[in-house]
């Protein structure tokens, strides 16, 4: 009798165990996908480093590069967290920070990359020759502030020229059509105008106290406080990609031709006027402050940014040379 009970209990227990095995939800081990980093870039040659990012992404991460037409659009994408990081002009960064937006500059992207170009045979050889001429200037950009300062240095103001609002990508075309007499542009536009013979160089506007400061690399303040490791990873990628592009001109030209849709000759004409860099040193910070002072004097901003929080060099300072 006892053996029957034990046998019955054993079979019942076995059935219960099988039932549990059949109906219980199995434990599924899911492999986590890579961490996706979204980076904004501009359709300009001095924003070409982001297109090399994917060559330097460490294991466990994936990079997505999103192109933007204007610096303000890229900066706004950072502010709204549409991207995690972005490359844009110092002007867009200062405008945002002065308005209280949580944008933080954590590295540099490029110096130089600007030029004042005139229509060939238009008799424009210097800034003073622009008086009364139609000059394309894109408002709210780094180039605009440099141009206004160069006018001031020559005893002129914006009222001495006829400013025409034209985006960087359209300036060469407008010059070719005769819609404008000159423009204050961003590479590769000037390189296209010079290599095609349509334009002539008036000057590279780097003689001001702002030097050749141009593009910076920024993120949202929340990314710094909540994801500092992500910032460190991104800075490592940015540093390696920037150094690679800066020291491999052929690769830089090929990438720019592919991504920007310009002829090799035009890109080659632009490269000498582009200084790719990730370093954010005391000189660049001082130039940024001078730049912000100019924007305040021009009433483009109502107050200066708080530079104690606007620029954070801690991540760049921690990057080890490769």
Feature roles, as predicted:
Residues 296-322:
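Conserved C-terminal helix/tail region of periplasmic/extracytoplasmic solute-binding proteins
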Residues 225-302:
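Secondary-structure end/capping motifs
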Residues 76, 80, 94, 128, ...:
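Solvent-exposed, polar/charged alpha-helical surfaces in well-ordered, non-transmembrane soluble domains
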Residues 20-23:
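Hydrophobic h-region of N-terminal signal peptides that target proteins for export
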Residues 25-30:
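Sec/Tat signal peptide C-region and signal peptidase I cleavage site
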Residues 1-18:
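N-terminal secretory signal peptides and thylakoid transit peptides that target proteins
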Residues 32-157, 162-168, 181-188, 198-204, ...:
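Short, glycine-/small- and polar/acidic-enriched structural segments
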Residues 91-92, 169-258:
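Pocket-lining segment of extracytoplasmic ligand-binding domains
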């Amino acid at each position: 009798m006892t053996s029957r009970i034990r046998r019955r209990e054993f079979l019942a227990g076995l059935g219960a165990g099988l039932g549990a095995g059949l109906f219980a939800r199995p434990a599924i081990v899911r492999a986590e996908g890579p961490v996706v980093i979204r980076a904004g870039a501009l359709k300009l040659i001095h924003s070409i480093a982001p297109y090399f990012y994917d060559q330097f992404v460490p294991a466990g991460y994936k990079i997505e590069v999103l192109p933007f037409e204007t610096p303000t659009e890229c900066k706004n994408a950072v502010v709204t967290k549409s991207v995690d990081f972005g490359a844009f002009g110092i002007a867009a960064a200062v405008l945002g920070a002065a308005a209280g937006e949580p944008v933080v500059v954590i590295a540099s992207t490029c110096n130089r990359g600007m030029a004042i170009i005139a229509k060939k045979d238009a008799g424009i050889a210097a800034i003073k020759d622009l008086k009364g001429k139609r000059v394309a200037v894109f408002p709210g950009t780094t180039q605009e502030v440099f141009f206004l300062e160069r006018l001031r240095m020559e005893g002129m103001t914006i009222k001495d020229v006829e400013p025409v609002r034209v985006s960087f990508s359209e300036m060469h075309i407008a010059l070719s059509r005769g819609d404008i007499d000159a423009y204050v542009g961003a590479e590769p536009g000037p390189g296209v105008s010079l290599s095609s013979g349509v334009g002539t160089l008036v000057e590279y506007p780097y003689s001001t106290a702002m030097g050749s400061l141009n593009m910076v690399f920024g993120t949202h303040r929340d990314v710094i406080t909540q994801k500092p490791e992500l910032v460190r990873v991104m800075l490592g990628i940015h540093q390696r990609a920037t150094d690679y592009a800066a020291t491999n001109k052929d690769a830089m030209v090929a990438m720019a031709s592919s991504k920007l849709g310009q002829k090799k000759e035009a890109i080659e004409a632009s490269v000498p006027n582009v200084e790719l860099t990730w370093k954010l040193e005391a000189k660049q910070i001082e130039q940024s402050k001078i730049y912000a002072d100019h924007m305040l004097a021009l009433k483009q901003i109502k107050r200066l940014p708080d530079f104690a929080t606007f620029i954070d060099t801690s991540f760049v300072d921690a990057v080890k040379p490769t």
